[in-house]
Amino acid sequence: MKIAVLGSGGWGTALAMLLEENGHQVTLWSYLEQESKQLQATGENPLLPGVKLPAGLSYTWDLDCVAGSDVVVMATPSFGVRSTAEQIAGRLSPGTILVSVSKGIEKGTFLRMSQIIREATGDRFPVVTLSGP
């Protein structure tokens, strides 16, 4: 499967690593160009000290990485979920599965992250949630 993980924090990076190690073609998106280049150059995320990133992982700061993806994992901070979802809505292929892994509710609307993603993408894609304790 072709998978884009949006958000290169500790959670997004850990999920990207696991997905890549399980044989998927994974691209890890970072909001900042410099951060993306640093991950690629060092093979490490400073948020996960001592953990080597898999050689097969791809890095980008371009949201076009979602085009043609079978799955898009939304691992951005909650304050950036709506904006990111709105920006990718027109780039998604029919049938793309959106996975919400961001915690929290939106200030003002009190919507869950999965509800924001569904609303921002026009309710045209399946949205699932992965959460923990």
Tell me what each language-model feature is.
Residues M1-V51, S58-W61, Q87:
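NAD(P)+-binding Rossmann beta1-loop-alpha1 motif at the extreme N-terminus of oxidoreductases
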